[in-house]
């Protein structure tokens, strides 16, 4: 497992309509990673479904983890799944994971909201919500970082972690690896950490479980 083996195939930029961003970028990076950090304006569990083949590989075979920071503008379905975790569905996911990765991919693709709850309940995914302290505007940062323990691939651009952003809309991202642009990659790693730890002036970041109803309005 090494992100550096992708250096010959990773492009400097990806654009929806021209490139198949999910199978050409997201999935290969997930498969070679131990962690995925993502800061976005918008997130929906549909993104897990789209990249299921890579997500499942990272969290099951690689025993990797994801950290997500997003604005509180989540779908009602995703909020409900996270707040009212269906223990039966979580157990179903656990049994499938023990049996077959391919079956698990199919399950994540078919039931992304339950997959979201399963990943959070199993510690595979941590979610924090970011918002301006002033109450004006929204958190709309877009940073992504894949890491394998030694190397990293970072990306920035217009894509949100949604079906629209990853497939349907006209969007683009710029990508760079630590082997060719270490300073730029490290900048993005630190920028994500600052957001995650709540060290960005004017922005709060709190764990999803501590979010009040008012934050989602």
Tell me the role of every PLM-derived stretch.
Residues 1-217:
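PLD/PLD-like phosphodiesterase catalytic module centered on the HKD motif
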């Amino acid at each position: 497992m090494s992100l550096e083996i992708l250096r010959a195939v990773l492009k400097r930029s990806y654009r929806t309509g021209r490139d198949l961003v999910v199978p050409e970028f997201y999935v290969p990076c997930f498969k070679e990673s131990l962690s995925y950090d993502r800061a976005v304006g918008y997130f929906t569990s549909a993104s897990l479904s789209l990249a299921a083949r890579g997500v499942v590989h990272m969290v099951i075979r690689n025993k990797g983890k994801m950290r997500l920071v997003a604005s509180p503008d989540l779908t009602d379905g995703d909020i409900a799944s996270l707040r009212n975790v269906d223990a039966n569905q979580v157990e179903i996911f656990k049994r499938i994971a023990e049996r077959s990765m391919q079956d698990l991919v199919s399950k994540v693709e078919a039931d992304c909201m339950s997959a979201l709850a399963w990943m959070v309940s199993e510690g595979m995914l941590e979610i924090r919500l970011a918002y301006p302290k002033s109450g004006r505007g929204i958190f709309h940062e877009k940073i992504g970082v894949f890491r394998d323990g030694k190397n990293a691939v970072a990306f920035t651009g217009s894509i949100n972690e949604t079906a629209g952003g990853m497939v349907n809309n006209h969007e683009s991202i710029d990508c760079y690896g630590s082997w060719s642009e270490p300073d730029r990659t490290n900048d993005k790693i630190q920028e994500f950490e600052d957001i995650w730890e709540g060290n960005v002036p004017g922005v709060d970041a709190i764990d999803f479980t501590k979010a009040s109803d008012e934050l989602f309005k």
